[in-house]
C-alpha cells in the first residue's frame, strides 16, 4: 500500500464498497454524533466522510485531531446509512470506517476558518494566504485560472501561433507607467528594468523572420493599485503577427477570446459577431471607451432642444460651440423619488446636480427643465429619445471632453438602479480608431494617447500634413462588460514614419535611437508589416469567475498598499547587498 494514499478524497464511489483504502488530507469538519466521530477529510480533489467508532483502534487518536490537521486514515469503504447520503458530493454515497489514523501535520489555532465562506479582513486573508487558498471558492478560482490559461494556449496553437519567451531583465523605456528598476552589480550605476510588456521584443521577433508569436507574459508596472489592477505585476496573452491588416488580427483573436468565454462562462450567452465601435462614438454613446453593452441605454446629443431656450443655464453654455447637452434615457424612471435620488447621487460625485425631465401618464413633461423649455421642446426630446409615459431623461451639459466620464457613470448608475443590465451574459466589442495623439495638460505638449509604436491612419503622409490631434491610429481594444480586456494595434514598421511620429510628440531622432536603439536598428534591415495585441489574463479570469477583485483570482497577491503581507515584501536590503550594488538609500525626510 502507498505510504500516504491509495485514493484521493474525491475518488471513492460505490465501486469501492468493501475495499480497504488509505486516504490523506486535511480535517475539514469534525462532528461528534452520540460518541461517534465524523471527519470530513479534504484534499485537492474533494471530500470523503470518515467515521471513527469508539470500538475502533483509531478512535483515541481521532479525538485529538482538530480543524486543518493533516492526517492519514486507513479503513474500509461502506455505503452510508440510508437517508444520510449527500448528493452534492461525488463521494456522497459512501464513507470510510476508519481502522488506523496517523497525524502527518498538526495545525495551530486557525486565524481564519477554512470551512465555510465567511468574509474576513483582507489583511488576515493575505497574511495567511495558504489558509485562504484552501477555501473552496478561491481554490476553485485558482484552478479555473489554470484551466483558462491552458485553453488560451491550446487555442492560440490551433490558430498557428508559436510560443516564445522574451527576456525579463531589459532596458527601461517610456511606455506609460513607471518601470521597476533592477540595479546592475556588474555595471555600477546602471539599471535593468522589468518589462512593462514585451512590446519591443515581440516586434523584433517579427523582424527576425518569425510569423506568429504568443506567450503568457508576466508584465511589471510600478503604478497605483486598483480593484481591477494588481499592484506590481500582471499576466497577459501577448501576440504578434507578420504581414497582417487590422482585420487579420481580429479574425485570429476573436475566436480565441470568444471560445474561452463560451467554455468557462457557465453557459451565459457570449457575443457572436462583435461590433466595431469607433472610439469617438463609444464616448458619445456610452461615456466610456470600454462600454458595458449589457446596459441598453444610449446617450444622445440634445443640444438643439436647449439652444435659445428659457433654461438659461444650458442656453448660455451652448453659446460656446465646444459645449453640448447630452441626454441619458431612463425607461421606467419617471418618478420624483427616483429623479431626486439620481440628483443626490450626482452631487455625491462632485457635480452640481443632474437635470431631469420625467413624463407622467398623459405624456406631459414635468420637472424644472420641462417647465423652463416648454411642452414643444420637451415633446421633441421625448421623441428623439424614444421615451414613453412613466419614463425620464437625465441631462449633462458642458464641454464633452470634460464631462463624458461623468456622463458614462450616470448612464451606468441609471441602468443599475432601473435594473436594465442583464448580468447573465458577456457582451464583447472592438473599440477602434483611437486618436494617435492627445494633448497633455501636465506637460503642455502633444503626447501619444496609447501605444507609440502603432501605425497612424494615413501613414507618413498624415504625420506630415495633418493636425496631429486629428490623426487616428490603427489601434484597438476589446471591451467586455465595462472592462478593457485587450489592447493592440498595427505597428509602424517604417523607420522614417517612426521618427516623425516621435518627433511630433517632442522626441528627436537621437532620443528615439537612445531609447529604442534595438528596434530602430532592426527597422533599417527590412521590417515586415506587422501587428498584434495583448489580452489581460487577470481581467478575463476575473470576469469568468464572477468576481470584482483581482485578488480573488491570484495566488499570492499584494494588498492595496503594494505590500506582500505573507512574504514581507518589499523589505530592506542588507548593507552588504547595497555595497555590492554600489547604491545607497536617499530616503525622504519624515
Swiss-Prot record:
Binding site for L-aspartate: 175, 221, 450, 491
One Pfam family of this chain: GAD
UniProt entry keywords in alphabetical sequence: Aminoacyl-tRNA synthetase, ATP-binding, Cytoplasm, Ligase, Nucleotide-binding, Protein biosynthesis
Segments of this protein annotated with the region Aspartate: 199-202
Enzyme kind, highest EC tier: ligase
Protein residues bound to ATP: 221-223, 484, 536-539
InterPro entries in UniProt: Aa-tRNA-synt_II, aa-tRNA-synth_II, aa-tRNA-synth_II/BPL/LPL, Asp-tRNA-ligase_1, Asp-tRNA-ligase_1_N, Asp/Asn-tRNA-synth_IIb, AspRS_core, GAD-like_sf
Keyword Protein biosynthesis: yes
Site features described as Important for tRNA non-discrimination, chain residue numbers: 33, 83
Similarity field: Belongs to the class-II aminoacyl-tRNA synthetase family. Type 1 subfamily.
Binding partners and assembly: Homodimer.
Protein name, UniProt field: Aspartate--tRNA(Asp/Asn) ligase
Origin organism lineage: Bacteria, Pseudomonadati, Pseudomonadota, Alphaproteobacteria, Hyphomicrobiales
Gene this chain is encoded by: aspS
